[in-house]
Amino acid sequence: IIGSAFTGGVVGNLYNSSSAAVALTGLQNEGTVSVGANYLGSAEGENSRVLGQFFGGIAGYCKNITLSGSTSTTRRDMTETQLKTAVKGGYAADGALTDDSPLKGDFVGGLVGFASGCKLENCTTQKGYVLGRCFVGGMAGGFSGSQLKITGGSNSSTVLGNRYVGGVVSVNGSQSTVSGVTNSGLVAGLGKNAAYVGGIA
């Protein structure tokens, strides 16, 4: 699956407008979710658009959703040699990432790209690769909102990005909690000005 924004292995946008959370259980994805564009924002009346954000193994964007017992495995067929070749081909002379780099997109997660007011319960990401540019997480690219929780579960994927890269979540936002979650995947920041990299967040 290749998308420019709001792209997921099961659904692109899980937006629940009600105040009560909707529960989804046992979702699975074993396909590759690829980012087709880096971040680009514009506002031109009715033609406003945002590209290059919100990519996830299950969902690109979630709001007021409880996701439990779900599993995602992305890029599991990619070999280490293929990854190294792709990454090396995506550097400019000064070490900056180019548009040819596989490290594209903001808010990229093994399960969800970005979640607001959501819970992830006992979800896992299997051995594979989660690749993005900024705000890249093994389970979630970014979290925001009250009572947001990740409980249980694990990440086994290799997580690579440029800035704000975490084994579980890239940035743990306002009033959010992460507990009982393990990460066994490699986490690394690559390219010029790489920064803010953590095993969990």
Where are these regions (language model features)?
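Surface-exposed loop/turn motifs in large extracellular/passenger domains
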Residues: I1-A201
